[in-house]
């Protein structure tokens, strides 16, 4: 029995050491920094995706010299002789509905993503602004930042998916002759999907950091000696107990 109990104790101590090593590597502070890094990466990618004219590409077998590119704000044509020439859309009235809605969604994505980074900065551990920030307030700021990152990522995914859906529908339109060239996916489509995923992952990491911080607080409170000391019994109470 003594050998078995010793083995159990060794196993439990080894597990505790492994858990401690994992907690050292994965702390709430590191998770917060990782969330900010991923969110900033998604925000920068979303900002670039919003303004580059590479959402859709068009090239035909009849005219291989010209390559057309279309974005949310410009339409560009590339030729070997002249190079690339871009022209902005003249009016909102003549703009397709999918591009107009995608413009709004991408601007909302950029705005909420930037706000998420700004809100998360004072909520990070080790960042003290002014007279100090309470832990409960920091926790609330990180939660708000996570929600904003989620909104930013979902709006970016919705905008890119909308343009992708319309492009697929127009590509397989049976009413158009086979000779007519069709728009295809551009590089900005894929960068928009990746940026949306980064923002969603960044928001999720903010929630994970909050949960890890709450767990650390619970473990700290549980380790505190809060066992009340027994009051000394009176002499007459001891006598009645003996009787």
Residue ranges and their predicted role:
Residues 45-54, 89-100, 134-148:
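Hydrophobic alpha-helical transmembrane segments
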Residues 92-103, 167-170, 204-217:
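Alpha-helical membrane-embedding segments
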Residues 52-103:
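A surface-exposed beta-alpha-beta supersecondary segment
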Residues 1-43, 48-64, 70, 128-138, ...:
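Intrinsically disordered terminal tails
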Residues 86-132:
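Amphipathic alpha-helical interface segments within eukaryotic helical scaffold
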Residues 35-47, 103-120, 139-167, 188-203:
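Alpha-helical transmembrane segments of multi-pass membrane proteins
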Residues 128-134, 157-190:
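Juxtamembrane loop segments immediately following a transmembrane helix
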């Amino acid at each position: 029995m003594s050998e078995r109990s010793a083995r159990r104790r060794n196993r439990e101590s080894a597990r505790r050491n492994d858990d401690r090593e994992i907690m050292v590597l994965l702390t709430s502070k590191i998770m917060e920094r990782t969330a900010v890094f991923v969110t900033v990466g998604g925000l920068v990618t979303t900002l670039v995706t919003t303004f580059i004219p590479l959402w859709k590409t068009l090239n035909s077998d009849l005219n291989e010299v010209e390559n057309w590119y279309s974005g949310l704000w410009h339409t560009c044509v590339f030729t070997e002789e002249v190079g690339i020439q871009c022209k902005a859309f003249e009016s909102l009235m003549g703009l397709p509905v999918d591009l107009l809605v995608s413009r709004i969604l991408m601007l909302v994505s950029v705005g909420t993503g930037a706000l998420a980074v700004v809100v998360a900065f004072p909520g990070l551990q080790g960042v003290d602004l002014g007279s100090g920030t309470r832990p409960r307030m920091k926790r609330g700021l990180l939660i708000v930042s996570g929600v904003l990152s989620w909104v930013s990522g979902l709006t970016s995914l919705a905008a890119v998916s909308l343009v992708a859906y319309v492009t697929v529908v127009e590509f397989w339109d049976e009413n158009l002759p086979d000779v007519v060239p069709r728009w295809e996916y551009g590089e900005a489509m894929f960068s928009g999907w990746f940026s949306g995923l980064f923002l969603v992952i960044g928001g999720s990491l903010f929630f994970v950091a909050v949960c890890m911080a709450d767990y650390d607080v619970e473990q700290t409170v549980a380790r505190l000696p809060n066992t009340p000391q027994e009051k000394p019994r009176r002499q007459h109470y001891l006598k009645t107990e003996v009787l």
